[in-house]
């Protein structure tokens, strides 16, 4: 058995050596802690001081006017300045101190003239230039990013701010059902082969679950562990009716119907996913009257029908902050009063480091446009409770997602020639960076996955029946304990 985290004098930090994950050789902290409260205070205080220069209106009118006018510029200035001036969260760890040229080859002369030697390149400029072929990396992408603090600067750039102002903010404000369908179609209908080349045969685009940290379980094992866990938490029985909202390629729907003989319905906006899932159900010998994949918005389901069990795995991020409460209320209305909801959602930590912010903006631009509802756990819980749900259990699966992403990363590299032949170098590079950076971000807490088990907050709900499925309270001691008398 491998040991727990041990101190490595070469990097000045504790490191792990667990077979289940891609272990961090240099688990160093980044610069700054992003605080929404601090930003809000600055945005609110600046117009207060400026009111003295607008003497022709009442204080309230002047303040509101200045708040509207200065809010966005102040936010931009805050991000630009703080990302450059903030210190590392903890000043520990030993960087290699190598030159930029040891990590990459900069092919663009103008870029090379500005960034060389010990001059760190902004991370956004690096990945954009890499996608465009202006930069080639030396060695493995994941290895390169493990030492990113030695060669990259995690600062907000004008290009990032332009994206925030012209794309991200309008998406958050005007997020619509039509936008969801367009973005889902663009991403998930790119080609089943594209997704299979990293997702593998299970075709599950959500986090798997580790069961043994000292064993490198296959991607299929991680996903099978997750399917079993979700169905256990749902307490599936033959008489159940299951709804999978955002069912992907139908693997969970098929698994539930095949193993628990329940009636399972999956909904997706993707044409490719619906066709693939329908075929998967048939290929597994499940009768069409017991399982089906519908290509439709779940809000278009028959409002009079209720489901005894509902599951949604990493779909809610795409709903958008503006429509989140409405989405959860719709889910509430679809669930029977004694039903169970398993709600798995990707999220972030409440106090970001600036590298988390820059990674999040990359993800929104290149991988999951419109997925603006990846929020902190406390925010998600608050929204669920406001919708009328009560939490039974929460599991934080960030490191499990890192393990899953690492398997996806390995698959993507294995299928490089196929990707290049059909989709080209740029798409290969974008996904290589996405997968490698996400392995790290999920492992170190910048992003995570929350698996939440819920039911309606009603007096008549029989909470005692949930105890057998509450996995985290059932333990097997490593040795027989000596009891206190």
What are the language-model segments listed below?
Residues 2-223, 229, 260:
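Feature captures hydrophobic
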Residues 238-248:
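Conserved class I S-adenosyl-L-methionine
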Residues 249-260:
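Conserved SAM-binding loop of SAM-dependent methyltransferases across substrates and taxa
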Residues 285-298:
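Conserved SAM-binding strand-loop segment of SAM-dependent methyltransferases
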Residues 299-310:
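A short acidic, Gly/Pro-enriched loop at the edge of an enzyme's catalytic core
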Residues 325-337:
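A short glycine-rich, Lys/Arg-flanked "PGG" loop and its adjoining helix->strand segment in the class I
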Residues 338-346:
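Conserved beta-strand signature within the Rossmann-like core of class I S-adenosyl-L-methionine
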Residues 346-462, 468-472, 476:
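Substrate-binding/catalytic lobe of Class I Rossmann-like enzymes that use SAM or dcSAM, i.e.
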């Amino acid at each position: 058995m491998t040991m727990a985290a041990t101190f490595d004098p070469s990097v000045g930090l504790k490191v792990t050596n667990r077979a289940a994950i891609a272990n961090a050789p240099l688990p160093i902290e980044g610069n700054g802690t992003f605080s929404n409260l601090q930003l809000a205070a600055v945005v609110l205080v600046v117009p207060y001081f400026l009111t003295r220069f607008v003497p022709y209106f009442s204080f309230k009118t002047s303040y509101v006017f200045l708040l509207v006018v200065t809010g966005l510029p102040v936010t931009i200035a805050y991000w630009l300045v703080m990302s450059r001036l903030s210190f590392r969260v903890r000043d520990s760890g030993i960087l290699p101190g190598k030159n930029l040229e040891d990590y990459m080859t900069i092919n663009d002369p103008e870029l090379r003239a500005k960034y060389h030697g010990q001059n760190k390149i902004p991370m956004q400029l690096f990945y954009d230039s890499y996608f465009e072929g202006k930069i080639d990396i030396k060695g493995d992408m994941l290895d390169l990013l493990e030492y990113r603090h030695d060669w990259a600067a995690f600062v907000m750039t004008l290009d990032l701010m332009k994206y925030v102002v012209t794309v991200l903010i309008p998406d958050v404000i005007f997020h619509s059902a039509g936008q969801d369908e367009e973005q889902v179609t663009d991403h998930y209908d790119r080609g089943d082969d594209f997704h299979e080349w990293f997702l593998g045969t299970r075709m599950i685009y959500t986090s798997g679950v580790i069961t043994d940290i000292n064993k490198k379980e296959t991607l299929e094992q991680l996903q099978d562990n997750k399917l079993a866990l979700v169905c256990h938490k749902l307490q599936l029985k033959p008489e159940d009716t299951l709804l999978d909202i955002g069912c992907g390629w139908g693997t969970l729907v098929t698994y539930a119907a095949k193993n628990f003989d329940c009636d399972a319905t999956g909904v997706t906006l993707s044409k490719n996913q619906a066709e693939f899932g329908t075929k998967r159900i048939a290929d597994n010998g499940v009768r069409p009257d017991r399982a089906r994949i519908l290509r439709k918005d779940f809000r278009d389901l028959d409002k009079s029908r209720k489901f005894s069990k509902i599951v949604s795995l990493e779909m809610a991020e795409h709903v958008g902050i503006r429509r989140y409460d409405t989405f959860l209320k719709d889910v509430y209305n679809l669930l029977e009063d004694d039903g169970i909801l398993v709600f798995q959602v990707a999220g972030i930590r409440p106090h970001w480091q600036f590298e988390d912010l820059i990674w999040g903006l990359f993800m929104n631009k290149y991988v999951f446009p419109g997925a603006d509802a990846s929020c902190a756990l406390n925010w998600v819980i608050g929204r669920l409770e406001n919708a009328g749900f009560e939490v039974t259990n929460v599991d934080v699966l960030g490191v499990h997602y890192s393990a899953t992403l690492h398997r996806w990363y390995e698959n993507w590299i294995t299928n490089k020639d196929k990707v290049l032949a059909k989709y080209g170098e740029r798409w290969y590079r974008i996904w290589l960076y996405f997968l490698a950076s996400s392995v790290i971000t999920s492992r170190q807490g910048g992003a995570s996955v929350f698996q939440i088990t819920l039911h309606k907050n009603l007096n008549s709900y029989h909470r005692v029946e949930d105890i057998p499925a509450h996995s985290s309270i059932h333990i097997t001691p490593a040795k027989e304990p000596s009891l206190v008398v």
